[in-house]
Design a protein with these regions (language model features):
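Bacterial Sec-dependent N-terminal signal peptides
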Residues: 1-40, 419, 425, 440-441
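A small-residue-enriched
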Residues: 34-120, 257-327, 332
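Sec/SRP-type N-terminal targeting helices
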Residues: 44-48, 61-62, 120-147, 197, ...
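Periplasmic alpha-helical coiled-coil/stalk elements that build and connect Gram-negative outer-membrane
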Residues: 55, 143, 147-257
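Acidic, low-complexity, intrinsically disordered peripheral segments
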Residues: 69, 78-80, 87, 417-441
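Amphipathic alpha-helical coiled-coil/helical-bundle segments that mediate oligomerization/assembly
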Residues: 161, 199, 216, 366, ...
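Extended, amphipathic, non-transmembrane alpha-helical segments
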Residues: 167-188, 215-226, 360, 372-394, ...
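Short terminal targeting/anchoring segments
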Residues: 197, 396-420
């Protein structure tokens, strides 16, 4: 809820025909926000995104672990492989350049081995790990941003519901006053002291108030449905808001970095890390440890010399891959990344400049709204007094029905302006908190 708040003076009102709203469970703003943190589906999606980023970070780190694979290969040669052998190997007197085709091997060949590969140094793997860590930070910042947005949306909906609820209270009070006036005018007509058109004018005003009440009531129900949707609770659940409005003093909040600015900074960190990885991959080699152990089998299935024999084989070694020239692909990627970093820095400056302008505008709007609240509150009291005096003067025969209707319209206009001023104030205050990065405080 709002802090450092003083309760606004709300004129005592009476309620008629609004039993449905009264029967609903009343939720405070804090209850709505606390429930949304638990049930809001947008927050659940972003929480899952954080978990996904955590697993991606673990996936990147897993590339440093050794990879072990088992391989089995069996070949049956219908035709044995043929090799060309120099004939002077068998007969030195044969001149060079003469060959003889000879088939080597046996039909059955079996190879089975276990192979291990482990990166000893790979700049791309280490860069991917650093990127995954930064991406995880970005996911958490995105969650904070969505959390703040949900808080902002729920608070705005709650304020709108409060304004509509108070508007209904005003309409109820005005409708009661109109009904009283209508009864008095009907009595005067029966006594031939008023015209039929006077009664019709008041009846028209009563009908208009009933229509306004119905429209505002429908808007109120729609706002409550949107509030339930943002909280994440079923539409069937009854929810109502506190009718009493609250107004803050003109506090000056301390400005902190907004989540949007922190996201831009984290993205800048990611871009610079990607640039570092590209520079490393251009000049540094990759080194892998490789090892293999297995067996090779040879078989012959013709009698009487059929056999199947296996011979062990194993090795340990290093693989080194050094980039010499890749067609300037890496260079072009580096140039692109530098421009992305430049755009990111410009975006950070733009966010900061825009934030300052919006804070100044919102603070000005808040100051104006607070003064308007004071003025319209006085106008309501004055309009109420004029209306009551007009009723009294009409009974004394001094004021006309037109005077009463004008006073009634002035009262309703003052009430509407009062509620609009409160809404402007609350929205401006909430916007300032959002712009200064303290909306969750």
């Amino acid at each position: 809820m709002l802090v450092n708040a003083r309760k606004l003076l709300i004129i005592p009102l009476f309620f008629i025909g609004w039993h449905t709203v009264q029967a609903q469970e009343v939720w405070t703003l804090k209850q709505c926000i606390d429930s949304a943190i638990l049930h809001n589906k947008t927050l659940k999606v972003n929480q899952n995104n954080i978990n996904i980023s955590t697993y991606k970070e673990k996936e990147a780190k897993a590339n440093l672990l050794p990879k072990i694979a088992a391989n089995v290969d069996y070949n049956y040669f219908i035709e044995l492989p043929t090799q060309l052998m120099p004939m002077n190997v068998f007969n030195p007197q044969v001149p060079e350049g003469q060959f003889r085709n000879i088939q080597f091997g046996v039909p059955h060949n079996i190879n089975a081995n276990v192979r291990l590969t482990m990166p000893l140094y790979n700049p791309q793997v280490y860069g991917a790990i650093e990127n995954a860590i930064i991406a995880n930070e970005l996911s958490q910042l995105q969650f904070q941003k969505s959390e703040e947005q949900v808080l902002y949306d729920i608070t705005t909906l709650y304020y709108n519901a409060q304004i509509l609820k108070n508007q209904l209270y005003f309409l109820d009070s005005n409708w009661i006053n109109t009904q009283k006036l209508l009864k008095n005018m009907q009595l005067l007509k029966e006594q031939l002291l008023a015209k039929g058109t006077d009664v019709s004018k008041i009846q028209l005003q009563a009908d208009q108030l009933s229509t306004q009440k119905e429209n505002v009531s429908n808007k109120y129900s729609s706002i409550l449905n949107m509030l339930k949707l943002n909280i994440g609770i079923p539409m069937e659940q009854d929810v109502d808001v506190i009718a009493e409005l609250e107004e803050q003093q003109l506090n000056h909040y301390t400005r902190e970095n907004t989540v949007d600015f922190e996201i831009v900074k984290a993205y800048n960190k990611l871009l610079n890390n990607e640039l570092t990885v590209l520079n490393r991959s251009k000049t540094l080699p990759t080194i892998n440890l490789v090892a293999s152990y297995g067996t090779t089998g040879f078989g012959y299935d013709k009698a009487p010399d059929n056999f199947l024999k296996f011979y062990p084989i194993g090795f340990v070694g290093l693989q080194l891959n050094y980039p010499i020239f890749n067609g300037t692909v890496t260079l072009q990627k580096i140039n692109q990344k530098k421009l992305e970093i430049s755009n990111n820095e410009l975006q950070a400056q733009l966010i900061d400049d825009k934030n300052r302008v919006e804070i100044e505008n919102s603070e000005r709007q808040k100051t104006m709204a607070q003064q308007t609240i004071i003025n319209t509150k006085n106008q309501i009291n004055l309009a109420q007094s004029i209306y009551e005096q007009s009723i009294l003067q009409q009974k004394q025969g001094v004021a006309t029905l037109t005077d009463i209707l004008l006073a009634d319209n002035a009262l309703r206009e003052a009430q509407q302006n009062y509620l609009l001023a409160i809404m402007d104030y609350l929205k401006a205050d909430l916007e300032i908190k959002k712009l200064k990065g303290i909306i969750k405080n």
